[in-house]
Amino acid sequence: MTAGTAELRGRSLWDVLLPLLLLLALGRLWLMPMGSSFWVDEMGTVFVVQHGPRDPSLSVAPQVPQSVYYLLPRAASALFGSSEFTYRVPSLLAMAAALFLIARLAARLIHPRGTWFAAFACLALRGFDYQAADARPYGLGTLVACACLWFLVRWLDSAAWREALWFVVPAALLWRVHLIFWPFYLVFGIYTAERLIRRDTPVAWKRAAVVFALLGVALLPVLFQALALYRQAGAHVIVALPSVRDLVLSLKLGLVVVCEAGVWLASRALRWRADGSPLPRSSRILIASWWLCQPLCLFAFSRLTGNSVFVARYLWLALPGAALAATWVASRFVPATRWKPLAAALGAGVLLLNGQWDRGWPWHHNSDWRGAARKIQELRLGPDTPVICPSPFIEAKPPVWRPDYPLPGFLYTHLGVYPVPGQIWLFPFEDSAEAEGFARQLSGQTLDVSKSFVLYGGQGQVGFWKDWFNGRPELAGWSNEQFRTFGDVEVVLFHHPSR
């Protein structure tokens, strides 16, 4: 066998193995969770699609329907019916397209043969995989961000007006997908300025100014909308102010370090000699800004304003940057002929470590609202059995919350998506004087004369009210049974011993 024949066979082996690994990974990490239960925010998507963005109950969270994303699940459900799988299809397709663009950008910015490695580096990040089966705007946002950078690079390479317009269109769309994506516009400015200053582009300053001015005009309506909503920002804070440790963890340094150390060890053990040239400065600037701008800006905004927006899903736009950073540091030790074997090793590791192999069929989110609602149905409760339902949304506070809050409504959208039998009693998101006053009234007038009642909601909320009702003198002697097989959703059944 000649050396050329051996190389050809080796090449054909990787050309078969890598697509197979990718299909297996996408099947396990993306496709299999598609039919699992919605989590809270996805049920919000269902509410917006079914009731429209102008439903009066959405006034408590006006930022929720402000996204062009909802056009996609609305179209999908109109074509294929309403189901978990259908609502998630737009995100699945968006992330597949984003993965393709990231691979193409890796070829342009790092190495022509680094595409597979970059793709599997993306799949190594759980937040990246999560978006593919999530009926929320983040998958579309990742695709639009990738498209922006792809066309920005092409425009700065060619100076063609057509490429400039192809950049402006998704760039004008990005902020309309989610208002929290504003820091990403710094990536466009930093990369463009780098190439203009170093004269690494045929694009002239005047032409660049025209293109960015056009983009600015397109974004003005969104800017006014964002400024109006900012006045209410404090009412929607769901996380504490981030620490420096939170910032460091958000950068996914583990992936970067593992890729660099693993490839370096392999190169030392196998005596590889990297044959690529150092990355151009502009490529390094683009990768670094993609990786760092979103987390750094949201960290600074949170600390300066006191309104924390440092939420993991708001940072997902930076994950492809982390994957490209991992590919970049690995490229310093990889000969051109070794990219595919290394990508295969990374892909196998991703499938092994991220596959949720403790479950036969992986969940999308650790919230089985569908299973919890089914459990309540299996209890065969009478139509008058009280079912106490705390809202899963932080906005459910007095005075917006009240015991006679009208249904269907956004704050209790889970009751419309996964209905439960019984007489529904609505509780707020968290404890308050008004909530406890209503609970005392309910306990003395309704629960005391019932044979049983149910608590149904998030684990922390149900746990609080279980302890609260256990301490009521009128319920002394009652027993309760907890059902905790639904992730962070819980069902508790209270029984009267002699009824």
Explain the meaning of each model-derived region.
Residues 1-11:
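Short, Lys/Arg-rich, polar N-terminal cytosolic tail immediately upstream
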Residues 12-498:
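Terminal, non-globular segments
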